[in-house]
Amino acid sequence: MPNVSLTAKGGGHYIEDQWDTQVVEAGVFDDWWVHVEAWNKFLDNLRGINFSVASSRSQVAEYLAALDRDLPADVDRRFAGARGQIGSPNYLPAPKFFRLDKRTIAELTRLSRLTDQPHNNRDIELNRAKRATTNPSPPAQAPSENLTLRDVQPLKDSALHYQYVLIDLQSARLPVYTRKTFERELALEWIIPDAEEA
């Protein structure tokens, strides 16, 4: 479900000139806006991946593709806020969003690209190691062991790289936004039309 679904259309709008300058032209749409709970769940999923298993590695891209990242606001949709009256049983507090900048987005892209390592080359190396040899003596087994080691090394390297990138993501201090933070930092004013104009 996209983040904008947490907003409601109508009841007012942001000043268009402010929106165009401080949001559109400033590239705020290009950043990723991820709900705090969704981000924490995403990291939990990444921590659960066994990167040494090829079938598990493909899950990285799947988790990333499923991550909602759109801006939870528009010129006629106020940034997602609290729902209901505070203190009432149906009250829902204002959702919080992490704002991911270009550097963090690049880290996530790099993480998903680690899953694109080809498997055919390693299979070829293993097949080559199984070819019949004219000399069945014990020394002939040494090349086979070397080829096997060369086969697993790329996977070990990428698994180690995956852990490093994951640690960077977990330790990153991402800015947190609520409606108040968003409107204050971007200097946006929400206009409510007069009753006679509605």
Curated annotation (Swiss-Prot):
Residues 119-128 have a biased composition (Basic and acidic residues). Keywords: Capsid protein, Helical capsid protein, Virion. Residues 117-147 are annotated as: Disordered. Pfam families: TMV_coat (PF00721). It is found in: Virion. GO terms for molecular function: identical protein binding; structural molecule activity. InterPro entries: TMV-like_coat, TMV-like_coat_sf. It comes from the Viruses. One of its GO terms (cellular component) is helical viral capsid. Interacts with itself. Capsid protein self-assembles to form rod-shaped virions about 21,6 nm in diameter for the narrow nes and 22,4 for the wide ones, and 110-150 nm in length depending on the size of the encapsidated RNA. They display a helical symmetry of 23.2 subunits per turn of the viral helix and with a central canal enclosing the viral genomic RNA. Belongs to the virgaviridae capsid protein family. The genome of this virus consists of three linear, positive, single-stranded RNAs encapsidated in separate virions designated RNA-alpha, RNA-beta and RNA-gamma. Three proteins (alpha-A, beta-A and gamma-A) are translated directly from these genomic RNAs and the remaining proteins encoded on RNA-beta (beta-B, beta-C and beta-D) and RNA-gamma (gamma-B) are expressed via three subgenomic messenger RNAs. This is Capsid protein.
